[in-house]
Amino acid sequence: MSKLQKLELTWIGKDDRHENLEPRILIESPEYSYGDTNTENIIIHGDNLLGLRAIEDKYTNSIKCIYIDPPYNTGEAFENYDDNLEHSIWLDLMRSRLMILRRLLREDGTIWIQIDDEEQAYLKVLCDEVFGRSNFVNMISVNMKNIAGASGGGEDKRMKKNCEYILVYAKDYSLMPLFNGPYAYTEMSDLIQQY
């Protein structure tokens, strides 16, 4: 009897389990709250893995749309986080969070993940594994800045990066609702003249 084979991304530490992380108790801070006191919306300040574990039991299978903007792993160090991780560590960081995020989604829910080209290809394969390749909806290219030709205004002669991507996955593609039709493009000057 042969073992069922599948395509998957592997790396050192992939099989180390994070499910044993104890969920944390969230403490409400009224000084940061405003608006409708009966809303179910929450903002969690802290490590996102611990925050996800804290809400997992209450919100499993209940969130319709998730948007995340994870670290791009650009090789830089920022004030609030290190964006220079070894690729296997970055993949492990993403996988542990994506597994929880998938459990949080409703059956007709979608997740939207913004990323640049540094880890986009690896993230796509990882998401195929976590959400299922058949649940891939689309990859949207987002123009981040206008550049003047390949030189980007003349600072050097290499091609410039001017776009990022949003990977869109459904928890179950067959249950995902249809999108509204596209909006007609209107020039800003025409919009201003209307008012």
Give the location of each predicted region.
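Short secondary-structure boundary/capping segments
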Residues: 60, 81-85, 126-131, 154-159, ...
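Conserved nucleotide-binding/hydrolysis micro-motifs of P-loop NTPases
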Residues: 72-73, 117-120, 144-147, 172-176
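A short acidic (Asp/Glu
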Residues: 54-55, 122-126, 151-153
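Conserved Class I SAM-dependent methyltransferase catalytic core
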Residues: 87-141
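Short, solvent-exposed loop/turn and secondary-structure capping segments
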Residues: 76-81, 123-125, 139, 179-182
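Flexible, glycine-/basic-rich loop-and-beta segments that form/coincide
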Residues: 148-195
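DnaQ-like (DEDDh/DEDDy) 3′-5′ exonuclease domain used for proofreading
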Residues: 1-67, 74-89, 93-96
